[in-house]
C-alpha cells in the first residue's frame, strides 16, 4: 500500500491567511525550518496506478501539482484518482470537489448524512452526476475501491461549522458526522482519523496493535487559541482531542502499542509545527511523528 500526504494542516492551512501568531509568522517567513502546509488530505493506492482520495481539500489543485503520481497519464483527459471518500462534511473536506468538475469520471463515497449536505447545496451540482456517481456507504461495512478495502467507522465529533446554527444545540449530531477509516490492501492495514473529539473503548480496541495510524493533531492544548487571545473556542468545542494533557492523545495512545503514529490536521497555532519547540520534542519522545505535505509511506 502506498500513502501520500497531500495536505497536513487543519482548516485554513498553515499559515492561515490572516494569522500573525508566532507559529504562523515562521511559516510566512519560512524561518527556523518552518514548512507551509495545505489542508489535510491523503491519497492511497494498492498498485501505484489507481488512487483513492480521502477528503477533497480546498487546496486540491495545489496538492495535485505537487504530486506527480496524481498527474494525468494518458489521453486528452485522465486522472489516476478513481474514487473520493469523505470522512465528514467539513468545509476543508468537501470544497475541493468543486475543483474536480471538469467532466472526469470518478466515484464519490460518503455517509448518507454528508451526501445529504452536498445535495442541499446546489453549488455541488457543478460536479456533474453524469460523470461522478454519489454512493452512500454503511458504517462498519468494508467498501472495495481500487484494490483496497476501506471501512468507515464513527468517532466522536461534531456537525460541520456551517451547520451549527441549524443543529438545535446538538453539536455532536448523528453518528455519521465524523468518521475514521480503516484501509486494508489484503496484506497491511492502516487507520486514518483526521478528526476525533474523544478516545472511546471501541476506538481503543480498534487501534490496539495497529501498524499505522494518522490521528487528529489539531491543537497541542485544549485552550490553545484562548490563551493566544485569538478565539474563545477550545479544542473540545471544535470537536477535537488535544495532543497534550491527561485526557490528550499522547496519553490515550500510550497503552495501545501502535507501531507508527502520525499527527495530521494540525492547526496553524499548534506549536508542534515548530520542529525546534519543546512541544515537538515531547511529541517525538512519545513516539509520534508530525505529518508534512508530501510525506510518502509504503506500507
UniProtKB/Swiss-Prot annotation:
Gene of this entry: pqqB
Cross-referenced NCBIfam families: PQQ_syn_pqqB
Described purpose of this protein according to its UniProt entry: May be involved in the transport of PQQ or its precursor to the periplasm.
Pfam families noted in UniProt: Lactamase_B_2
Taxonomic lineage from the root: Bacteria, Pseudomonadati, Pseudomonadota, Gammaproteobacteria, Lysobacterales
Protein source organism: Xanthomonas axonopodis pv. citri (strain 306)
Family: Belongs to the PqqB family.
Highest taxon listed in the record's lineage: Bacteria
SUPFAM superfamilies for the chain: Metallo-hydrolase/oxidoreductase
Pathway field: Cofactor biosynthesis; pyrroloquinoline quinone biosynthesis
GO terms classed as biological process: pyrroloquinoline quinone biosynthetic process
Signal peptide (residue range): none
Keywords for the protein's UniProt record, in alphabetical order: PQQ biosynthesis, Transport
UniProt protein name: Coenzyme PQQ synthesis protein B
Amino acid at each position: 500500500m502506498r500513502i501520500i500526504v497531500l495536505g497536513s494542516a487543519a482548516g485554513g492551512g498553515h499559515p492561515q491567511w490572516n494569522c500573525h501568531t508566532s507559529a504562523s509568522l515562521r511559516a510566512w517567513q519560512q524561518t527556523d525550518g518552518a514548512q507551509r502546509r495545505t489542508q489535510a488530505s491523503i491519497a492511497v493506492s494498492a498498485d501505484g496506478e489507481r488512487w483513492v482520495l480521502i477528503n477533497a481539500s480546498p487546496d486540491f489543485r495545489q496538492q495535485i501539482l505537487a504530486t506527480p503520481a496524481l498527474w494525468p497519464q494518458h489521453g486528452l483527459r485522465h486522472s489516476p484518482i478513481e474514487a473520493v471518500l469523505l470522512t465528514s462534511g467539513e468545509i476543508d473536506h468537501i470544497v475541493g470537489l468543486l475543483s474536480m468538475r471538469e467532466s472526469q469520471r470518478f466515484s464519490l463515497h460518503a455517509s448518507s448524512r454528508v451526501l445529504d449536505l452536498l445535495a442541499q447545496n446546489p453549488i455541488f451540482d457543478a460536479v456533474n452526476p453524469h460523470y461522478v456517481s454519489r454512493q452512500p456507504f454503511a458504517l462498519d461495512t468494508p467498501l472495495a475501491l481500487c484494490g483496497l478495502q476501506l471501512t468507515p467507522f464513527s468517532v466522536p465529533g461534531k456537525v460541520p461549522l456551517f451547520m451549527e446554527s441549524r443543529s438545535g444545540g446538538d453539536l455532536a449530531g448523528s453518528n455519521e458526522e465524523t468518521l475514521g477509516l480503516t484501509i486494508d490492501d489484503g496484506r497491511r492495514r492502516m487507520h486514518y482519523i483526521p478528526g476525533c473529539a474523544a478516545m472511546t473503548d471501541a476506538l481503543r480496541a480498534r487501534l490496539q496493535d495497529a501498524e499505522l495510524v494518522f490521528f487528529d493533531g489539531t491543537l497541542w492544548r485544549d485552550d490553545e487559541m484562548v490563551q493566544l487571545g485569538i478565539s474563545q473556542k477550545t479544542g473540545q468545542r471544535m470537536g477535537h482531542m488535544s495532543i497534550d494533557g491527561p485526557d490528550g492523545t499522547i496519553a490515550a495512545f500510550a497503552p495501545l502499542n501502535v507501531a507508527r503514529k502520525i499527527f495530521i490536521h494540525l492547526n496553524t497555532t499548534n506549536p508542534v509545527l515548530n520542529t525546534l519547540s519543546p512541544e515537538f520534542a515531547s511529541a517525538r519522545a512519545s513516539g509520534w511523528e508530525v505529518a508534512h505535505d508530501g510525506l510518502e509511506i509504503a506500507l
